[in-house]
């Protein structure tokens, strides 16, 4: 397995710890994180950390289950199900993620998904 693919596997696994410092350490200082159905993009490590803190804070559990992952040089893409517990609700969200890697860190992350399951929370 390539280092870039392993980096993303480790990043995905880190989410289950809900440890924001561990998760944010995977990013470059100038990284960009975009949840495609949401605005705006999170630009820079500080903005990404703020978003992740808010997300992790509202979740009682987080698990990302990767079904398929492909690698093309510095690009890693995966199809996964994000299993998230928020209050009494459990969400299983199908996601397509694209990661760009630079110098052993994530420099760009784009997730594509349907907001429907979150809208159902009320």
PLM segments and residue spans:
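Hydrophobic pocket/interface hotspot
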Residues: 11, 23-24, 31, 44, ...
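Short beta-strand segments that buttress and anchor functional surface loops
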Residues: 78-86
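Hydrophobic/aromatic beta-strand elements that line small-molecule binding cavities or substrate pockets
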Residues: 52, 64-70, 81-82, 94-100
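A solvent-exposed, acidic/Ser-Thr-rich amphipathic alpha-helical stretch
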Residues: 20-73
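Short, low-complexity N-terminal intrinsically disordered segments enriched in polar/charged residues
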Residues: 1-29, 120
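Short beta-strand edge/turn micro-motifs at domain boundaries
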Residues: 94-120
């Amino acid at each position: 397995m390539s280092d870039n693919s392993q980096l993303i596997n480790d990043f995905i696994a880190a989410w289950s710890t809900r440890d924001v410092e561990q998760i944010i350490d995977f990013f470059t200082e100038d990284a960009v994180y975009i949840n495609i159905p949401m605005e705006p993009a999170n630009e820079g490590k500080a903005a990404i950390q703020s978003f992740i803190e808010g997300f992790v804070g509202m979740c009682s559990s987080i698990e990302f289950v990767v079904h398929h992952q492909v690698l093309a040089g510095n690009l890693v893409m995966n199809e996964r199900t994000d299993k998230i517990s928020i209050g009494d609700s459990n969400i299983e969200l199908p996601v397509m993620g694209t990661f760009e890697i630079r110098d052993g860190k994530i420099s760009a992350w784009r997730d594509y998904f349907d907001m429907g399951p979150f809208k159902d929370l009320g």
